C-alpha cells in the first residue's frame, strides 16, 4: 500500500501499519509528540490500523485536533484522580472543549483546595505513565460492565445507542472509561495541565435531572504554552465583562432573583436603549414593519411549530399536561407569533416580501453550568425579524439580511472580530430535524453559494442547524476565547407548511412562501457584554 504524507511525499508498505508505526517510520521525535492521526481527512486514534492506499497526517499538540486528543486524555486522568480520592463519585461525561476540557461527576462540590489535591493525584497518575489501550464490547456487555461498577450515567448513555452497536472503551491501568476517543498512547503524554474551576451542571443540560459537579481544566503540549495561557487568563479576567460591567454599574445579579436573570442598571439601560432605537430605525429604513406579540402562548402553538417536540427542554413550561386543561410556555422565540400576524390577512404575490421586526423579550431554560454574566442568560432582549417571501425572492432577501448584519457589525467597529459559520443538519440524526434530505441539501447549497458569491470566508458545522433549516451563524470570541453566536440568519423552507401559510399567485392559486429568520445585532445583553470587553 502507498501512504501519502502531508508534505506530499509517499511511503510504501507491504503490510498493514498502525498510525503510530507510520509516525515512528517518519521520525522518532514526531512519534513521541504524536497525539492523534488523520486518515483521508478523518481524525483517528494512533492505534488505528491502515491497510490501503490513503493520505495520513500525524497530529501533535501544535495542531488543533491533536491538542483536542491531548485534552481529552487529560479529562480521563482527571476522572481517574477524582475516583481515587472520592471512591463514591460517579462519572458522567468528560470531553475536550475549545479552551481545555471538563468532566462531570455526581459528588460533592470541589473547593480550590480540593482541586489542588486532585491536581496532585493527577500528577501521580501521569508520572506512573500507564499505557492507554482501546477495546470494544457489545452493547449488552457494556451495559452489564457499568451496571456492575454502579455507573448509572454511563449505562444511560449506552442505552441510548442503537441495538447492535459496538461500544469502544479506553483503559489506563486499572481505570476504564466509555469513550470514542481518540487518546494519547500513555498518560505520560499529559505534560502540562491546570484545573481551573468547579461549578454545577445538570446532567444533559436539563434541570429535571441530577445536578452534577463539573470540573474545568486546560492542557497544552508544553509547560511554556500552559504558562502563557494562564497569564493570558489572568489578563482576560481583568477585561471580563462580568467584572467590568459590575464596576461600571451597567448590570448586577442577585441570588434571590435567580441565575441567568441579570438586573440592568440605569447606565446599562442607556446603552441598550440606544442600540434598540438605532436598530429599529435602521430596520424601518429597510422596509420592516413592527409587531408586538405576547410573551407566552399555549402549548398548542409550539406543537404546530415543532418546538414542543424538538425544544421543550429549553422552554419554561407553565402547567402540567396531565392535570391542567391548558398548558402555557414562555416564548423562546418570536417566529410562530409573527406567522399568525401574517395569517391574519390574505396576501397577494405582490405583497411579498413582508418583513416583520420586533424587539422581543425571550426566555430560554439554559443549563446553569453554561450561564455567565450577560453572554448566556435565561431572559434576554433581541432584535428579531421574520421575512415572508416568495421562493424567487429568497436569495436576494437572504443576502440583504447578511448585508444588514454586516452594516451593524461595521457601525459597532467589530466586523473584523467575527467568523461566519454555515450551520448544517446532521443526516445521521434524523430525530433532531424535520423535512426531507433533498430540501436540506438544496437549502444548504443555496447558502453556501451565497457566502461564496459574497466572498465571505466561512466554516461548515454539521449538526448545528435549527431543527427546521440551515443557517448562517456569525460568531465572536469572548476574552477567554470561547465562541458565542452574535447574529443568526436562518433559511426556512418548512414551517410555512406547518402553519398553512400561503399567498395568492398571479394565477389566483395558493402558493407556499419561504421564511427567513434573522437578527440584526442579536441579543442586546450579549452585545453589551461584547462591547464592554472590546472597548
PLM region spans:
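Active-site palm subdomain of RNA-directed nucleic acid polymerases
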Residues: 88-90, 405-419, 531-535
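Structured ligand/cofactor/substrate-binding pocket environments in proteins
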Residues: 268-277, 347-360, 380-386, 393-402, ...
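A translation/RNA-centric and nucleic-acid-associated enzymatic feature enriched
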Residues: 326, 336-337, 341-345, 354, ...
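Metal-assisted phosphate- and nucleotidyl-transfer catalytic regions
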Residues: 128-173, 410-489
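Glycine- and acidic
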Residues: 6, 256-268, 323-325, 339-347, ...
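Ubiquitin-like/PB1-type beta-grasp interaction modules and other compact soluble beta-rich domains
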Residues: 1-75, 79-97, 117-124
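Auxiliary tRNA-acceptor-end handling modules of aminoacyl-tRNA synthetases
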Residues: 51-69, 90-94, 102-361, 365-371, ...
Amino acid at each position: 500500500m502507498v501512504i501519502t504524507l502531508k508534505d506530499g511525499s509517499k511511503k510504501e508498505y507491504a503490510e498493514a501499519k498502525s498510525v503510530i508505526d507510520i509516525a515512528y517510520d517518519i521520525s522518532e521525535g514526531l512519534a513521541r509528540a504524536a497525539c492523534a492521526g488523520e486518515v483521508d481527512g478523518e481524525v483517528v486514534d494512533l492505534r488505528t490500523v491502515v491497510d490501503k492506499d490513503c493520505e495520513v497526517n500525524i497530529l501533535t499538540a501544535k495542531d488543533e485536533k491533536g491538542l483536542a486528543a491531548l485534552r481529552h486524555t487529560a479529562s480521563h486522568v482527571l476522572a481517574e484522580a477524582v475516583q481515587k480520592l472520592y471512591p463514591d463519585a460517579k462519572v458522567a461525561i468528560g470531553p475536550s472543549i475549545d479552551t481545555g476540557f471538563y468532566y462531570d461527576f455526581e459528588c460533592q462540590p470541589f473547593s480550590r483546595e480540593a482541586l489542588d489535591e486532585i491536581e496532585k493525584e493527577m500528577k501521580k497518575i501521569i508520572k506512573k505513565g500507564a499505557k492507554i489501550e482501546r477495546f470494544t464490547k457489545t452493547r449488552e456487555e457494556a451495559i452489564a460492565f457499568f451496571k456492575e461498577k454502579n455507573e448509572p450515567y454511563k449505562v444511560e448513555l449506552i442505552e441510548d445507542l442503537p441495538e447492535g452497536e459496538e461500544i469502544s472503551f479506553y483503559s489506563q491501568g486499572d481505570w476504564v472509561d466509555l469513550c470514542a476517543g481518540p487518546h494519547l498512547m500513555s498518560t505520560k503524554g499529559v505534560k502540562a495541565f491546570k484545573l481551573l474551576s468547579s461549578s454545577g451542571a445538570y446532567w444533559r443540560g436539563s434541570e429535571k435531572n441530577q445536578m452534577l459537579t463539573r470540573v474545568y481544566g486546560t492542557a497544552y503540549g508544553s509547560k511554556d504554552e500552559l504558562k502563557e495561557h494562564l497569564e493570558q487568563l489572568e489578563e482576560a479576567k481583568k477585561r471580563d465583562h462580568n467584572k467590568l460591567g459590575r464596576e461600571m454599574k451597567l448590570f448586577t445579579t442577585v441570588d434571590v432573583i435567580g441565575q441567568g436573570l441579570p438586573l440592568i442598571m440605569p447606565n446599562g439601560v442607556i446603552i441598550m436603549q440606544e442600540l434598540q432605537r438605532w436598530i429599529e430605525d435602521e430596520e424601518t429604513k429597510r422596509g420592516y414593519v413592527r409587531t408586538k406579540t405576547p410573551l407566552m402562548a399555549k402549548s398548542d402553538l409550539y406543537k404546530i411549530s415543532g418546538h414542543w417536540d424538538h425544544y421543550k427542554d429549553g422552554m419554561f413550561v407553565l402547567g402540567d399536561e396531565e392535570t391542567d386543561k391548558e398548558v402555557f410556555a414562555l416564548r423562546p422565540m418570536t417566529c410562530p407569533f409573527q406567522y399568525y400576524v401574517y395569517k391574519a390577512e390574505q396576501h397577494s404575490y405582490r405583497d411579498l416580501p413582508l418583513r416583520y421586526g420586533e424587539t422581543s423579550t425571550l426566555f430560554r431554560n439554559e443549563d446553569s453550568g453554561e450561564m455567565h454574566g450577560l453572554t448566556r442568560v435565561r431572559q434576554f432582549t433581541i432584535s428579531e425579524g421574520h421575512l415572508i417571501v416568495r421562493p424567487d425572492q429568497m436569495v436576494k432577501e437572504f443576502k440583504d439580511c447578511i448585508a444588514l448584519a454586516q452594516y451593524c457589525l461595521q457601525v459597532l467597529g467589530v466586523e473584523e472580530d467575527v467568523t461566519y459559520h454555515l450551520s448544517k443538519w446532521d443526516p445521521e440524526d434524523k430525530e433532531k430535524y424535520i423535512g426531507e434530505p433533498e430540501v436540506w441539501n438544496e437549502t444548504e447549497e443555496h447558502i453556501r453559494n451565497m457566502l461564496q458569491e459574497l466572498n465571505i470566508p466561512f466554516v461548515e458545522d454539521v449538526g448545528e442547524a435549527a431543527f427546521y433549516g440551515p443557517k448562517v451563524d456569525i460568531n465572536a470570541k469572548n476574552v477567554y476565547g470561547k465562541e458565542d453566536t452574535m447574529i443568526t440568519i436562518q433559511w426556512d423552507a418548512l414551517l410555512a407548511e406547518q402553519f398553512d401559510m400561503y399567498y395568492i399567485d398571479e394565477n389566483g392559486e395558493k402558493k407556499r412562501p419561504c421564511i427567513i429568520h434573522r437578527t440584526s445585532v442579536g441579543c442586546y445583553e450579549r452585545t453589551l457584554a461584547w462591547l464592554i470587553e472590546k472597548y
